[in-house]
Amino acid sequence: MTRRIKCVVAYDGTYFSGYQVQPGKRTVQGEFEGVLKRMHKGDDVRITASGRTDAGVHAYGQVIHFDTPLALSPEQWKKALNAQLPDDIAVRSVDEADSTFHARFSAKAKEYRYNVWTAAERDVFRRHYCAWHPYPLRVDAMSEALGLLKGTHDFTSFCSAKTVIEDRVRTIYQAEMEVDGPMLQFRFVGSGFLYNMVRIIVGTVLEVGQGKRPPDDIEALLAAKDRRLAGPTAPAEGLYLWRVYYDGESFGH
């Protein structure tokens, strides 16, 4: 009997060349599938994720699924996987899922967070986990800009020029930020996100905060559908795939 296993996985992306398997490079998928291969006596077991993350990008709530003939309980799976995975990957929870569940296609929404350290001095102990932006910021203007992103829009201006997906319409349900001393955290919940979309939004909103562009420039950028007009792509290290939402799960904090 084959079982479908769903895992919620956290990882520190610092020393990975991204999530997806790449020949000769250390990846999250490669490490995970290596452990599963050992557990299945040399048989290949493919995992499917809710989406890929780039080199340096972290995850607190990545979701993966795989099919297995092994008759282990969810708790046994969690213990076995965490005993063999490297220190920068942790399985947070395991459930046996219905055979129709799909980590990517069953997802209803995703939540990303982005951390920015705004102190005048660089913090060497945070350098892998937040972007450093030591400039005065107008938080009220940034909040106004974020509000204009909510709703259903074509986000062509806010995705990489390398994006091959033709349909770039997405719905942003929540776009907000919290300030805790010198730490600034952005939070985005949406139906889906294009390549580099969150990082380009953050780079653009930081320009609003510096007074380089007005908050309502967001509306003009959405209408223009031109990546060249938006701000820079914020660094990978500040980005976290925080949570993936499925049927029946609300988009609360």
From Swiss-Prot:
NCBIfam families: hisT_truA. The active site is at D54 (nucleophile). HAMAP family: TruA (MF_00171). It holds the Pfam family PseudoU_synth_1. It catalyses: uridine(38/39/40) in tRNA = pseudouridine(38/39/40) in tRNA. It comes from the Bacteria. Coiled coil: none annotated. InterPro entries: PsdUridine_synth_cat_dom_sf, PsdUridine_synth_TruA, PsdUridine_synth_TruA_a/b_dom, PsdUridine_synth_TruA_C, TruA/RsuA/RluB/E/F_N. Its EC number is 5.4.99.12. Substrate binds at Y112. Formation of pseudouridine at positions 38, 39 and 40 in the anticodon stem and loop of transfer RNAs. Homodimer. This is tRNA pseudouridine synthase A. Belongs to the tRNA pseudouridine synthase TruA family. Keywords: Isomerase, tRNA processing. The lineage of its organism: Bacteria, Bacillati, Bacillota, Bacilli, Bacillales. GO terms for molecular function: RNA binding; tRNA pseudouridine(38-40) synthase activity.
